[in-house]
Structures are given as C-alpha cells and as structure tokens.
Amino acid sequence: MPIEIPKDKWPGSINTLIIGGTEAEGGTRTSSVTIGGQTTMPYLHFEAPTPNKPVIGIEIKSRKPEDWSPLLTDVWGEAMADPAQWAKKAEEAGADLIVLALTVEDSPEDAVNVVKSVLGAT
C-alpha cells in the first residue's frame, strides 16, 4: 500500500529578489542571482514548484578573524589574510554569493579599498 504524503497549500509566496547587476543592467557583475519565489515551505518541493534553486553564500571578513575554529582557518588558510584572495577562494569553492562583512575597525578609506579589491577579484 503506497504511503500518501499530506500536502498543504500556502496562500502567500516568498518575494523574488535579484542580487547583482550585470553590465547591461548598469552593474559591475558578470552574472546575477535570483532567489525566492517559492509558494511552499523550504524542502517541500513536492507541494509546489521551486522556481529558483537554493544558492550558497559564503561570508568573508575584511579582517582575519582571530576567534574562528582551527577547522575553518585550516580550510581557508592564508586567504583569510586578504579579503580579495578569500573571495576568490570562496568563488572557487562554489559560492553563488559572497557576503563581505566589514568591521567597525575599518576606516571609511579601508572599507572602500576592501570592497574594490573584492569586486576586482570576483
């Protein structure tokens, strides 16, 4: 006897968001990422279609974190000392998105330089 999976219909939907603008759209990116649009809860793809695939985002920091687990520092290695190199390594690891976390210790000039270097590396 087959097992019937209970299904529910949700009245709302998750807003769709496009992150990143290509040059044709006035941005600096080579591609954009579209998220959202689901009309069901996460991982319940049998209830309704998932219009946009899940994406992976990796957070990098403007400064090397001193309080991270050795497991993470071993994986990222020396790339953690340079946000641009770290972003490139995150991209090579398969990240669809890179979250750049700036700190209050960054001066406005340093923050601008870090953002520009990460944009140039990705």
Where do the model's predicted regions map?
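A broad, low-specificity signal for short, low-complexity segments enriched in glycine/proline
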Residues: N15-G20, I58-S62, L119
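Active-site mouth loops of central-metabolism enzymes
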Residues: E4, D8-W10, V55-Q85
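Well-ordered, non-membrane alpha-helical segments in soluble/globular domains
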Residues: W76-A87, D110-A121
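Short, well-ordered coil/turn segments that N-cap beta-strands
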Residues: N52-I56, G94-D96, T122
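Conserved, mostly hydrophobic/aromatic
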Residues: A90
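Basic, amphipathic N-terminal segments that precede the first structured/catalytic domain
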Residues: M1-T34
